[in-house]
Amino acid sequence: MLGSGRRRLLSTLLQVQKRPCQPCRNMRLVQFQAPHLEEPHVGLESGIGGGVVDLNTFDPALPKTMVQFLERGETALSVARRALAAQLPLIPRSQVTFLAPVTRPDKVICVGLNYADHCQEQNVRVPKNPIIFSKFSSSIVGPYDSIILPPESKEVDWEVEMAVVIGKKGKHIKATDVMAYVAGFTVAHDVSARDWQMRNGKQWLLGKTFDTFCPLGPALVTKDTIADPHNLKISCRVNGEIVQSSNTNQMVFKTEDLIAWVSQFVTLYPGDILLTGTPPGVGMFRKPPVFLKKGDEVQCEIEELGVIINKVV
């Protein structure tokens, strides 16, 4: 028999699938598995909640990982555009296992205190420069995978974030040129062990990078699909209750400024992921603080990008 948490997750997924499929104006790139495939493939999600076009079946010469796909640049994207225009048969969503849209990137870069309203809830000043930290790529899991509570932490918290995916190698990128280096956007959950985040001189890495602490997906939405990435509703629900609700227009440093800043220090590569910060409503600043527990279900949703749903185990 299914446990209550598993039943709730399946129920939520069915509700998402029953929503009207939002027409795909452009590309929603995914990595997926299916029973008839021997290995993961790259595909196109046919709108939020829709089925999947198998790009590797459409063109067997295409790479089967998103990082390699992005490394091909315009050559790979042009194939995807042709597949989109061809209105190919879809693999039903019920037959697909969605992976994170990007796995094993060279870097996962994160930004702290990057929402004005998040700074307000902590009663701290808006940073003068971006606060940068990282997660290891081993923390990445798919949009519907479980979040594993580590026995080492008693204070695991939620953070919905918009993630930017790099599409082209670059260093010392000017803010005015940044979007030429961006492939697109996706939904991220910056799961955070607050007790470990505050230890070791407040070096955040250990508290941010436990296995399964970076669910991503469901799709890499190409930049030309989004009219304005800095004016999107962003929210998080825990067991159906809204705990975070804001808009990406509250970001202190926009995508262009963040990437220009980071690229002063490191070379960015195709597939690199930049989490752009979280809005207010995280558990640690509630009175009393609230943290995730086994059986909880977390939904992170961003307008036009989609929703990821992760059970806590």
From Swiss-Prot:
Tautomerase that converts enol-oxaloacetate, a strong inhibitor of succinate dehydrogenase, to the physiological keto form of oxaloacetate. It is thereby required to maximize aerobic respiration efficiency by preventing succinate dehydrogenase inhibition. GO terms for cellular component: mitochondrion. This is Oxaloacetate tautomerase Fahd2a, mitochondrial. Requires a divalent metal cation for activity. GO terms for biological process: oxaloacetate metabolic process. Residues 1-84 form a transit peptide. The modification N6-acetyllysine is found at K202, K233. Mg(2+) binds at E159, E161, D190. Coiled coil: none annotated. It is an enzyme of class 5 (isomerase). Belongs to the FAH family. One of its GO terms (molecular function) is oxaloacetate tautomerase activity. InterPro entries: FAH, Fumarylacetoacetase-like_C, Fumarylacetoacetase_C_sf. The lineage of its organism: Eukaryota, Metazoa, Chordata, Craniata, Vertebrata. Keywords: Acetylation, Isomerase, Magnesium, Metal-binding, Mitochondrion, Transit peptide. PANTHER family: FUMARYLACETOACETATE HYDROLASE DOMAIN-CONTAINING PROTEIN 2A, FUMARYLACETOACETATE HYDROLASE DOMAIN-CONTAINING PROTEIN 2A-RELATED. It catalyses: oxaloacetate = enol-oxaloacetate. Its cofactor is Mg(2+); Mn(2+). Its EC number is 5.3.2.2. The modification N6-succinyllysine is found at K202. SUPFAM superfamilies: FAH. It is found in: Mitochondrion.
